[in-house]
Amino acid sequence: PQEYLGTFLLISVVSLLGAGVLLGLRPPAPITSHRDTAEARPLPEIIRQPTYLVAVFGAATAYGVMVLAMTATPLAMVHHNHEMASAATVIQFHVLGMFLPSFFSGSLIARFGNLPIMLCGVGLLTAHVLISLSGTEMGYFVSALALLGVGWNFLYVGATTLLTGTYTVAERGR
């Protein structure tokens, strides 16, 4: 609806400003030891690695699914005659799902590996979609968005952790 247009435009402007600031940042040169002085590979060579592609695709998928569902849910809830306070509660459960697992997702990755945790995230995101399509009562929205948060955490944290293994110290910041 048009009543939310101003909010989305404001968020777009803030996002563009943030991107502009980030593009202007230059990370400091990494501190290297004599073991890290190997010549850096060209960026296209780094990007063509299958592991790199899996990591980037996983992180982008997690982010895309999360943003789409998180922004659409309050609109769907209002459309189905839920109070805005109920939509806020659903988003609170979602945010808990996104960040609470961070206390242990790193340990799970260390124990089971990146790919199993990423696949678990994909499974949770799939469960989110199935629950979202199953009904419009409050319980469906809460459980779907909570699963979305945990699925995002597992897939995004797993993917970005996987990404850190695709380059050397000399190749950071490219």
Which residue stretches match the model-derived regions?
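Helix-loop junctions at membrane interfaces in 12-TM secondary transporters
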Residues: 133-144
